Swiss-Prot record:
Organism: Neurospora crassa (strain ATCC 24698 / 74-OR23-1A / CBS 708.71 / DSM 1257 / FGSC 987)
Gene: mrpl13
UniProt family annotation: Belongs to the mitochondrion-specific ribosomal protein mL50 family.
Compartments (UniProt record): Mitochondrion
Name of the protein in its database record: Large ribosomal subunit protein mL50
Compositional bias of kind Basic and acidic residues: 126-135
Assembly: Component of the mitochondrial large ribosomal subunit (mt-LSU). Mature N.crassa 74S mitochondrial ribosomes consist of a small (37S) and a large (54S) subunit. The 37S small subunit contains a 16S ribosomal RNA (16S mt-rRNA) and 32 different proteins. The 54S large subunit contains a 23S rRNA (23S mt-rRNA) and 42 different proteins.
Amino acid sequence: MRRIPRIPSTASALCSSSSSVASTSAAPLRTLRAAADSSSICQSCSFSTQTSATRNRVWQNTVQTQRRCASTVTETTPEAPVAAAAAETATESTETVEQQRKRKGGFFETQRQVNLVLPGQPTRADAPEKIRDPNYEPATSGAGLQEIGGMSDWWSKPEHFRDGGKQFEYQGFAPQEKITDPRLLKVILRRALAEGLALKKFGANPKNPADMASIIGNGDHWQRTVSVEMCRGENGELSLKNESDLQKVWILMRNAAEKTYYQREWQEEINRLRSLGEKEQAKQLLEEGKKLGYRLKSEEGSLVKLTVDEAVELRKSWNNDWKEAIIRDPVVKFYAAKRIQKMTGHILSDGKLTSIQTVANFMDALVTPPKPKKLAEQIEQSSILPELPNVKVYPRRVTPVDKERMVGRWKVIQKELQKRELPVLGTGNHGKYVELKWLGSKQ
């Protein structure tokens, strides 16, 4: 058995610069800074998120309680993983923040508090020779003895989950309802490509571009992101006309990632305060977070805060040259696919991504509806047969019962069958004709 150390880590939103990082494992909110080298982004683009004094005061009052409620986890592991974990911990302690960011691909894993009530340490009963009760008779086997405690049904009891187990409920990456309007899909595609270009220029390791797509959160700032001018760059590849537009888009992405991270910690702290019975502090923190624009998960709704009229208005300033631009970079293509999946629910398979070469191909793969799975669906979508006066299309096979219902005889037939105690549908309790066996036919 070994005790896993709690390694302090910063937010998973974006990495911070090597100059200054304000982060501790105990502090519920951490100030994030720009994730870029000094050579790629100028000093004027660096920023930090300001928090109000009221929120800091509320959080500081709960830091000590959070430390008391922090739990440790024990597990049994072989010697090799233990040595690997120790080596990784030693490496992180000697590396700078910028070196850790590059080694981990540009992102930090978030250390989240698990709302579990862990079982206590096992206790042993006294030895038989130490018991002075003369009526005590030690058992020779476990048959018939009462079982006290144990781990057989520990995780089946709701009181062992401080939040009722909501933290462990499955949360899908993509929304359940897909966006099918082509006008919205084209605007979302343009935003995803602009963010992908900014991520390629200033962002993370090419191994995990989808991490950014999963933490950006709600799609705000549509006007500032979509209004950037796209064009065909060198060798016909897609690029932004102005270099400053890439920096603007990147800053918007970092701000959105920080907001998502702070909002998640804010909601976790509210749930923790409510579970401890500190309703006044939870209410104060809830009001302060709403002033900063934070929303609970139940209040977020759809990820895309964009209407059809707004999408049509945004498309008026676009040129048509960007549609013929080539997309060769796999980071841009893969990030755009994951970002679209996160916001619209459309999943672009690897085969489709491989065949996509230009923006127009990407748009066609996204806007074109999927092929119908049934022949009836294909006939319904076609406008030839349904428009004929003597043709009617049904979604399924027309049975004899359906034909009787069309002419109005089914109720009479059903009534007569019930009067004779015969099954209305199927054979009921009646077997097959015995005459078939006499005639030697197959049953």
